[in-house]
Amino acid sequence: MAFPTYRPVQCSKLTDHELLRIPHSPSLEPLDYCIEPISYLRRTVYDLHTTVANRSSSRALLHKQPPVMFKSPFGANANPFGGASDGATVGGNAMHQYNFSRRTSVSAESLKPSADTYDNWTPPVHDKTNEQLSRLKTAIAGNFLFSHLDDEQSAQILGALIEKPIPAKDIKVISQGDAGEYFYVVEKGSFDVYVNEKGTLQPGPEGMGEKVGTIQAGGSFGELALMYNAPRAATVISAEPGCTLWALDRLTFRRILMESTFLAAACTRTSSEKFPCCRHSHHMSAQKSPTRWKLRSTPLVRRLSRRETRVTRFTCSRWRGRCLPGEMARESVKHYSKGDFFGELALLNDAPRAASIVATTDVKVASLGKSAFQRLLGPVEGIMRRTKYDDIKTGVEEMDPLQV
């Protein structure tokens, strides 16, 4: 087959003016080059690709390399940053090592921390005897993960926990590298924690790695894998026979424990909108103060005495109360409702309480400790001192020593 002759195209509408050649016909005018059938261009590109492929095949035959053995990116000597593990792999195989050794993806179920995400989900309930409930409350009493829960959330946690007796010694409860499904609270006995530097449990007598700690009764473990959707970071085995654990499944843990933190912060942030320091000040400490508060439900403590220690400032979150200027006063001088606050005077002046606060309904307040109050709200002390109690008709001098 004879191919037509080629010459450079002198046409401003074609960008590849020196490299692109099309068949020449004496009968075509320069304008016709722009509307020449596209099949000639496709044929030219096809011939070019064929030539390059043939030359590459010939070059590969002349410089034949040994086959590259596949190396797992999850092995003991894998490099997560894509670098070569030794000098022999540096070269043509470096790109392959980089691609295979890239960091693996992290995925989990969607969990939007808001009040309307519960949908049709209900926490599981496992029946327990009164004796089991008593032991369980004692086991979680000092655990920091349960300290911020209200009564309703605590009841859900108590109902969802499952008792797991560990009858013998050296029983593996969790293994390093496995997927996390449960969070455990130790009621009785002790458990040893081992960490292998390779990241997973290895075979052999030394496969668990080095012992890094011991968890006694009242402690807990397994929360990191559930919070961060990561493999188990350690191996935990029973250190003595007759141990008892309480297990909480992953979904309940994330729904209750993690969302409760978000809801508590949202509640205190909403209540803080009425604070003078947070409403008028742009200071970063005042804006971050709601994250330091703790929600407290105190149905039994109905009175905050004027003689108590000045350690806490309370904010009304969901209740109604009345302020009494005297110890035996019968007439209230000020009423508090949702969003109001009290207790700042004693903290600003380091003085005794000037009044007694009596709750008329169930109390749910957000409290800020004295040290956090002085550290976070100290820069806005001037705004706090401008707060007046103008609606109080009696006992103003005794109640508000800041007024002059």
Curated annotation (Swiss-Prot):
* A Pfam family the protein falls into: cNMP_binding
Answer yes or no on keyword Cytoplasm.
Answer: no
Q: What keyword terms does UniProt attach to this protein?
A: cAMP, cAMP-binding, Nucleotide-binding, Phosphoprotein, Repeat
* CDD domains assigned to the protein according to its UniProt record, in alphabetical order: CAP_ED
As stated in the Swiss-Prot or TrEMBL entry, residues carrying the post-translational modification Phosphoserine are: S105
Q: Where is this region: Dimerization and phosphorylation?
A: 14-144
Q: Which domain of life is it from?
A: Eukaryota
Binding-site positions, 3',5'-cyclic AMP 1? 145-276
Q: What SUPFAM superfamilies does this protein's entry cite? A: cAMP-binding domain-like
Q: Which residues bind 3',5'-cyclic AMP 2?
A: 277-398
Q: Name one GO cellular component term.
A: nucleus
Q: Which GO terms describe its molecular function?
A: cAMP binding; cAMP-dependent protein kinase inhibitor activity; protein kinase A catalytic subunit binding
| PROSITE patterns for the chain | CNMP_BINDING_1, CNMP_BINDING_2, CNMP_BINDING_3
Q: Which residues form the signal peptide?
A: none
Q: Which family does it belong to?
A: Belongs to the cAMP-dependent kinase regulatory chain family.
What job does the chain carry out? cAMP-dependent protein kinase PKA regulatory subunit.
User: PANTHER family annotated for this entry?
Assistant: CAMP-DEPENDENT PROTEIN KINASE REGULATORY CHAIN, CAMP-DEPENDENT PROTEIN KINASE TYPE I REGULATORY SUBUNIT-RELATED
Subunit composition? Tetramer, composed of 2 regulatory (R) and 2 catalytic (C) subunits. In the presence of cAMP it dissociates into 2 active monomeric C subunits and an R dimer.
Q: Provide the protein name.
A: cAMP-dependent protein kinase regulatory subunit
Q: What species is given as this protein's source? A: Colletotrichum trifolii
